[in-house]
């Protein structure tokens, strides 16, 4: 179903967009903060475990977000952009949604395959690894997770710049649809 809607995305999509933004921002902050914290310290463990939890939350929010998004047509951008802009926007949004699913899955898989499980911050609880540890595969997935995370600084940056360009340059309603 692709039901048309008004001039804004449905409230669920708007809210989950901004919640996802905050969660991704915090995930990047926590994983980068660990570099400045002493190995083996409680603070570093908290940063790393928070990163894991934030990634899992991103995945849990993104799946229903995609389902709802597929059921609703995007509100029209007024004035309508050209074909090249629409194709670029479609491509960027697809990349962002793939990232929001693949990145947490890579992180979760690499951690579980390492045999260490996934600790939850400020608790003694952990999601245990299942099966035998596969350290080589876990390391490969972790490197891919890190590469994708680095590459997505650029995609996220382009997304933000495009929103600002629509708002300040084109003066259309693209950004307002998500507010």
Regions found by a protein language model. Give the residues of each.
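Membrane-embedded alpha-helical bundles that constitute the cytochrome b-like, heme-associated redox core
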Residues: 1-179
């Amino acid at each position: 179903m692709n039901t048309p809607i008004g001039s804004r995305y449905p409230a669920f999509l708007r809210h989950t967009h901004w919640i996802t933004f905050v969660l991704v921002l915090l995930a990047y902050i926590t994983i980068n903060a660990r570099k400045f914290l002493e190995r083996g310290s409680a603070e570093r463990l908290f940063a790393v475990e928070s990163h894991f939890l934030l990634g899992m939350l991103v995945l849990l929010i993104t799946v229903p977000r995609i389902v709802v998004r597929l059921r609703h047509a995007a509100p029209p951008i007024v004035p309508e952009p050209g074909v090249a802009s629409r194709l670029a926007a479609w491509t960027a949004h697809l990349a962002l949604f793939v990232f929001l699913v693949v990145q947490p899955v890579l992180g979760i898989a690499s951690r579980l395959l390492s045999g260490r499980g996934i600790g939850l911050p400020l608790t003694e609880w952990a999601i245990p690894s299942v099966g035998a540890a596969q350290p080589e595969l876990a390391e490969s997935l972790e490197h891919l997770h890190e590469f994708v995370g680095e590459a997505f600084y650029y995609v996220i940056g382009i997304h933000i710049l495009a929103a600002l360009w629509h708002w300040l340059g084109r003066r259309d309603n693209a950004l307002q649809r998500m507010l």
